Amino acid sequence: MNFYDFSAVKMNGETVSMSDYKGKVVIVVNTASKCGFTPQFEGLEKLYETYKDQGLEILGFPCNQFANQDAGENTEINEFCQLNYGVTFTMFQKIKVNGKEAHPLYQFLKKEAKGALSGTIKWNFTKFLIDRDGQVIERFAPKTEPEEMEEEIKKLL
């Protein structure tokens, strides 16, 4: 299995295969609208705007598993991200990232990202960096600001 074997549902209800992102550098991030890390949407959007023409994609996955910080409906979440942070990168429908009902993509990401943080998602805005071949290169903690990932991203572009 690799990253390209999975699919997810975008905010508009369209099912998208991760294979659509072959040849791209991808950041996968679990998001929340009412979290102390929510302002990271700005940094993620800045990275996307700066590097999208060089092959960067950012995939946002709202999740309500951490202190009920994304309790809204998908349409509310999408509007919030666009209106408050100008998000233009792809946002998917709300998922679970931990437990028996965790989305298969997140089950894969947690298994592939080695190190002390592997096995579970601890909080919102955990970020996974995936290379152009679909390999999980690095996992970044929620406190890691998007701009701190820039050098790693540039190496992969």
From Swiss-Prot:
Class of this enzyme: oxidoreductase
Alphabetical list of InterPro entries matching this protein: Glutathione_peroxidase (IPR000889), GPX_AS (IPR029759), GPX_CS (IPR029760), Thioredoxin-like_sf (IPR036249), Thioredoxin_domain (IPR013766)
Molecular function GO labels: glutathione peroxidase activity
UniProt-listed Enzyme Commission number(s): 1.11.1.9
Oxidoreductase among keywords: yes
Short name of any one Pfam family annotated for the protein: GSHPx
Biological process per Gene Ontology, one example term: cellular response to oxidative stress
Keywords, comma-separated and alphabetical: Oxidoreductase, Peroxidase
Active-site annotation: C35
Catalytic reaction list: 2 glutathione + H2O2 = glutathione disulfide + 2 H2O
CDD domains cross-referenced by the UniProt entry: GSH_Peroxidase
Family statement: Belongs to the glutathione peroxidase family.
PANTHER family per UniProt: GLUTATHIONE PEROXIDASE
Name of the molecule in the record: Glutathione peroxidase
Organism of origin: Lactococcus lactis subsp. cremoris (strain MG1363)
